[in-house]
Each structure stands twice: as structure tokens, then as C-alpha cells.
Amino acid sequence: TDADWHPSGYAELFHVLWRASAARIPLSDADAELVEPLTAWLVQEGRRLSALELLGGLAAARAFERRTIADFSAFDAVLTPALAQPPQPIGSYAGHSPERTFAMQVEYAPYSSFVNVAGLPAVTIPVTTDAEGHPVSVQLVGRPGGEATLLEVAAQLEARRGPLPHPPAWDA
């Protein structure tokens, strides 16, 4: 069964929360060059947030949490992809502005972030491999306190799947 779930406004609240969280990193302007440009940018952007923006983001997160829990309540578990894209090569984010790098990473892994914001339990299970031998995984999202159910369903998926082949690189 498909869940009738539409996370409107999620991207905006996530950006506020992520920047606000980064603002707490004890990083001086002089030391900004010692960290990744993305980290320095997030810290700087987070420190620019107003109290009103932060409170708005926190209120939106609470509303998102309540709405997501309510929308998923009819299900013992909700199945999502683990990632929105295939594995990216090392260095694929290099050469982009910090803002673009952040957007690319959000687009790459949107499913785990919404689960974290909603405070729901989740487990990721590799279900197959791609042509290069990279694992392809799904994520099971459960109800609040539903960890035992998730582990039971994950064990059933793993048993049905059988052993995964090891990556070709292991033979090199």
C-alpha cells in the first residue's frame, strides 16, 4: 500500500535546522580554512540565522514530525530507497560551491534526513548489488518505539534475499 505522504516545506526546515546545528561548532573565522568549505559555509550561514528563523524552523520540524507520524501510523513499516542516487565516486562534490555541495548531498540522501527529523526508528538493508558491485539498499521506517518490528522485518528481508555477492574489488 502506498502512503499518502507529501513532505511539503521539509527542505526549507531541514536547511534551517542543519545551518543552526552547524552554528554551534566552535569555529573561529581564523580557523575556517582548517575545515571543509561546506562546513565553514554551514557555520557561517547558521550564525546568520535570526531567532525568528530558528524558531520558525523548530516549529516547522515539530509540525512535520507530528504529520509524518500520523501519516505513517497505519503501517507497521514504511519502505523507502536508502539513497536517491547510485553511489557517487570519491571527489564528486569537489569543485562545487559549498551551497551547491550541500544541495547535492541533500538530493543524494533525502530519506534518512526526514526520518531523523521525524524521530522515527529506521534500518537500512542491502537488498542487491549494482553492476559495479555496490550495494543497493532499502530503508524501513517504523512507528515510534517500533524498533523490534523493524528488526523482525529486516531479518525476514535478509533471509529472503540470501547472501550478497562480494564486490569485484575484493578479488583484486
Regions found by a protein language model. Give the residues of each.
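Acidic-enriched catalytic cores of C-N bond-cleaving enzymes acting on peptides and small amides
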Residues: 1-5
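Short glycine-/acidic-enriched loop or helix-start segments at secondary-structure transitions
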Residues: 10, 86-91, 134, 150
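Short, surface-exposed loop/helix-turn segments at secondary-structure junctions
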Residues: 14-17, 56, 88-109
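Short helix-loop capping/hinge segments that flank enzyme active sites or metal/cofactor-binding pockets
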Residues: 16-69, 81, 85, 124-127, ...
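Structural helix-boundary/capping segments
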Residues: 55, 59, 66, 116-172
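Small-aliphatic-rich amphipathic alpha-helix that forms the alpha element of a beta-alpha
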Residues: 69, 100-126
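Basic phosphate/pyrophosphate-binding loop/patch that engages nucleotide-derived ligands
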Residues: 72
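Short, Asp-centered acidic motifs that coordinate Mg2+ and/or phosphate
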Residues: 76-77
